[in-house]
Amino acid sequence: MAKDIRVLLYYKYVPIENAEKFAADHLAFCKSIGLKGRILVADEGINGTVSGDYETTQKYMDYVHSLPGMEDLWFKIDEENEQAFKKMFVRYKKEIVHLGLEDNDFDNDINPLETTGAYLSPKEFKEALLDEDTVVLDTRNDYEYDLGHFRGAIRPDIRNFRELPQWVRDNKEKFMDKRVIVYCTGGVRCEKFSGWMVREGYKDVGQLHGGIATYGKDPEVQGELWDGKMYVFDERISVDINHVNPVVIGKDWFDGTPCERYVNCGNPECNRRILTSEENEDKYLRGCSHECRVHPRNRYVAENGLSQAEVVERLAAIGESLETLVAQ
């Protein structure tokens, strides 16, 4: 059965004059054709994921390709049964990818048009994965890695991308004098991060051209050596990559059983992404810790209209009490 919706994932590092006005004009056009999605615009380029029916997405691609400097912009296309977004957002930012460099000086940022790692095709990347002398580094957030990653890839001990440069500096013995290949969802983060590694003095740095999304669609590699699913920042949450021998590697936050269902911790001050079943979400009040379960503004408790007595009952079932809540 044909799927009616197309999801477009794309980015391009290209100088954009008057980027704030560009963002406003871009939003107006997207709304005029009924497109949904999330787009970041900066002086350094554009980065977005959008969805719509065939006609709408075709209009959008034609429009983008008509813009100066974007004639060759590469759209990665998924076909789906439902919209991947509920609304349309286009926002101006200082950068489309923020590396979190320690001096926070945007003039000292990496320009991928000048400095970036060597591009590897899916076939070349797969060959590198099988090379014991190559270090494979996942540049995504921890919760993205936990849902799915390339076999043998290093999981940096970080919560988000901004922490990655410092983590690499702190663990440089893992990478110095070795070939390093990096990957991310669609390629936008790796363009900048691989350039940063080159600037740091790493001699042999490669990146998966087009990211995981392209690797999964390649007719030759068919996503092989990828375990789990790929996390995406839209209503789908995850997509399949390995079409040869897929496996589930995600583990439930609470009991460690295989799981590929993500929720945000019920404590709005925590908001950690955790893998868990519906059963355990109910059992643990969607809280990743006792502190989060008993937090006065626990969203799970509010959404389900639980009384204090019901909360006490749920906590007692897992050997906990409301004492922390009372203390607050």
Swiss-Prot record:
Q: Which UniProt keywords apply?
A: Oxidoreductase, tRNA processing
A GO term for molecular function: oxidoreductase activity, acting on paired donors, with incorporation or reduction of molecular oxygen
Where the record annotates domain Rhodanese, the positions are 130-224
- Does this entry carry the keyword Cytoplasm? no
What Pfam families does its record include?
Answer: Rhodanese (PF00581), Rhodanese_C (PF12368), UPF0176_N (PF17773)
Name a single GO biological process. Answer: tRNA modification
Q: Which SMART domains match?
A: RHOD
What the protein does comes down to: Catalyzes oxygen-dependent 5-hydroxyuridine (ho5U) modification at position 34 in tRNAs.
- Say which family it is in: Belongs to the TrhO family.
Protein name in UniProt: tRNA uridine(34) hydroxylase
Q: Which organism is it from?
A: Streptococcus sanguinis (strain SK36)
